[in-house]
């Protein structure tokens, strides 16, 4: 990796290697950076990885963290080193990134109809590649290529997946009758349910389906309800693969409200930006916009006494009733929804608790 003028957030007109940059042990606030800048907190990343790894070990589960959150080789390496079974992907493009990094086990948690991608996937020497199907047409496209298929169970009004257990059973029978494919198990996503009671009902249906079909693998589990997934699926006579991915970055909004480990996970993503104007009493404008920080679930979280009231392409509106900030001040912002944070940055400094840059994350979205 080379750090130069193309690396957003870095003041590095003359190129240096990542190794040279890290050897300098730059400070976040005195080093060659410009604002806005997203950073990751090393202690929080490491803590979150350890916490989930311990949880899955303690409950006899396998973990295939969803790589879509970070698409970062350095973070994938942390997760795999902590014991992850493999990685989850949503698209063939993500699988291509994983393959280039040498990842040997992938769960493609999405239906696939792209014939060019199917042909490429069929040629890859994975230790294990699991793919989804929820219709006869999907099975037909996968036929004859050696794919191991998870039948996806959905629910009415939900996302993908067979709408009833009977549909899923019929699809399993079709897989058994089709040459060149193998029934690997069942899978689903509980996060489209309206509440925890709905999640529990759905997971009971998924477990019952898996038992009826003697499924070798059962998979579920985003980052919001993995406690319920553990309660309902742990201890099955099957390999249970859970897929939380957002946990590694956690946040100060959506997952702080929703995660069953909200009191134990730590926000690892911080965005720093500079006040560029205080044009009227009670208002400040920050050089931070939609290209820099997530805004799909919540607006960014400002320091105490300040509130983000609006976000534009390059500017953030702050309510500052106490007149706490002035132009030039650098502020820390928290995020909501890490899955739409990492994609905004190609290189992300990792800082220790003294705000020294100790690593660089690259992303491939």
Where are the regions a protein language model picked out?
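C-terminal accessory subdomain/extension
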Residues: 279-365
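Flexible, glycine/charged-enriched surface loops at secondary-structure junctions
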Residues: 61-62, 214-217, 327, 342-345
């Amino acid at each position: 990796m080379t750090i130069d003028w193309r690396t957003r957030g870095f003041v590095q007109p003359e190129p240096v290697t990542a190794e040279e940059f890290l050897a300098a042990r730059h400070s976040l606030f005195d080093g060659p950076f410009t604002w806005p800048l997203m950073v990751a907190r090393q202690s929080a990343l490491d803590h979150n990885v350890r916490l989930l790894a311990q949880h899955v070990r303690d409950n006899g589960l396998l973990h295939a963290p969803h790589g879509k959150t970070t698409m970062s080789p350095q973070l994938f390496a942390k997760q795999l080193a902590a014991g992850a079974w493999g990685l989850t992907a949503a698209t063939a493009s993500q699988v291509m990134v994983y393959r280039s990094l040498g990842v040997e086990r992938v769960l493609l948690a999405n239906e696939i109809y792209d014939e060019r991608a199917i042909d490429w996937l069929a040629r890859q020497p994975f230790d294990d590649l699991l793919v989804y199907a929820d219709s006869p047409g999907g099975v037909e496209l996968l036929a004859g290529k050696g794919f191991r298929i998870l039948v996806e169970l959905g629910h009415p009004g939900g996302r993908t997946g067979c709408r009833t257990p009977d549909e899923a059973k019929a699809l399993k029978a079709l897989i058994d009758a089709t040459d060149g494919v193998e029934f690997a198990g069942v899978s689903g996503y509980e996060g489209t349910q309206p509440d925890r009671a709905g999640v529990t009902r759905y997971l009971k249906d998924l477990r019952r389906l898996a038992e009826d079909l003697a499924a070798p693998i059962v998979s579920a589990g985003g980052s919001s309800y993995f406690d319920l997934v553990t309660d309902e699926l742990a201890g099955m006579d099957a390999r249970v693969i859970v897929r939380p991915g957002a946990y590694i970055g956690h946040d100060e909004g959506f997952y702080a409200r929703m995660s069953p480990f909200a009191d134990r996970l730590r926000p690892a993503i911080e965005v720093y930006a500079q006040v560029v104007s205080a044009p009227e009493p009670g208002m400040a404008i920050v050089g931070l916009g939609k290209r820099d920080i997530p805004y799909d679930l919540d607006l960014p979280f400002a320091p105490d006494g300040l509130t983000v009231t609006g976000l534009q392409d390059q500017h953030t509106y702050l309510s500052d009733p106490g007149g706490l900030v002035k132009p030039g001040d650098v502020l820390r912002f928290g995020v909501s929804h890490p899955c739409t944070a990492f994609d905004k940055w190609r290189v992300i400094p990792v800082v220790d608790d003294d705000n020294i840059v100790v690593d660089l994350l690259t992303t491939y979205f």
